[in-house]
Every structure is written in structure tokens, then in C-alpha cells.
Amino acid sequence: MGRIVAGLMGGVPVVVMQGRVHYYEGYSPEEVTFPLRVLGALGIRAVVLTCAAGGIAEGYRVGQLVALGDHINLMGWNPLIGPNEPRFAHRPGAGLRFPDMTEAYSKALRALAKQAAAEEGFALDEGVYLAVSGPSFETPAEIRAFRVLGATLVGMSTVPETIVARHMGIDVLGLACVANLAAGLGATALSHQEVFAAGRHVEQRLALLLERLVPGIAALVEPATNEEKQP
């Protein structure tokens, strides 16, 4: 079961969602992205999406945090398929039938995250996240193909939420934890247990990073105007 917690972090109003549903669990695209629609209706201007991912790039270490600079959608579906819903847009220029994804992940928020990470004493690399539908882990041959495509990370979430957030005009910062080395790159078979173990290993570092980040994000992202809040 997931949880929703609303409160203040560094004096900044935040909504934190713990847990998400996935397409591989049998949920529809609308259900997978519904939390983002709710957050958009609440008037949020930026979202930090976190995920666990398999590391494809050479040099990645289990437990490493990586900022998403771009993504490749190989899930086989797009959450915007169907009638366009411009009423969900919460910023001028958003809600388009064909939203631009040139900067799916905010360059300004990535720079802010790198600065916050440096202040915490570690480097935050950028990566390209490739999304598949799951639930089976990828094969070594697929990982070799994904590397040719330019992917440095692979996972089963995040991309649908990013697409919907950008459709609504919400700025996105994506942070991935390298939970394992992708298939064929490590010495052992992949398991969900190692994903959980990596998450526990990085949770404190991620919490400290977010504490530094939130005030900076609030200062960077302008609040919604009364006109924009009107339905």
C-alpha cells in the first residue's frame, strides 16, 4: 500500500507519495499516471520522480544516484493515447495534443541537483533511462541493444509519469538509484531482493539531497497565478 504525506520541508509546502502502481501489475495507463494528474490539480509546479534502475553504463556502481537527462520509451504505450485533455494543463502552453519532449527533464533542476549533491560530498552523474513494461528483467541481448541505443539505465516506471507531468506543464527532476547491474553485466542473477537492498542503502543520502533541493526548487519554480489556477 502507498502513502500520501503533505507537509513542510524547509518551510516549503510539499506532497510526498510513497509507492506507485505499475503497468505490469495490470493497471491501466490512466491509473498509473493518476497520481500526477492529482498533483497537477493541486497546483504543483515541479515534481521529483525517484526510481530504482538497472545500470547499463560502464562505471556505474550499485547504490549510485543518477539524474535523468533524457529517456527512451520502449514500454509499448503512451499515457496520452486517447482524447486530449487540455483541462489538465496548469501552465500556459501546456495541454497540447503533441507536447514537446525536448527537455523532458528540467535542465535547471538537474543543475540544482548537481549543486546540492556536491554540497553533500558526492558527484551526481546524468543518464538516459530506458523504460520497458516488465515484469521480467531484461535479457543480456536486450541490454546490449539498449546500450547501442544510448541508454545508461533501464527500468519499468517513471517515463509515463514524466510524459503526463510535461503534458500538464510540470517541471520534472528524475533521480534513479542504480539498484543492480543490468543483465549480463554482473556476476549473479537479478532479483527483486537486491533492488530493495540497494534502495535501503541509498535512502539516507537521497533524503539529505532532497532536504537541500526543495528550497532551491521552490525558489526556481514560480508559483501558479490565480488565472492559471482557474479551471
Report the location of each language-model feature:
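His/Asp/Glu-rich mid-to-C-terminal helical/loop segments that flank catalytic regions of hydrolases
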Residues: 183-231
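Active-site rim beta-loop-alpha module in soluble metabolic enzymes
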Residues: 100-147
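General beta-strand structural signal in soluble alpha/beta enzymes
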Residues: 16-18, 47-51, 67, 124-130, ...
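Metabolite-binding pocket within alpha/beta catalytic cores that recognizes anionic/polar moieties
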Residues: 1-101
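Zn-dependent metallopeptidase/amidohydrolase metal-coordination segment
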Residues: 156-194
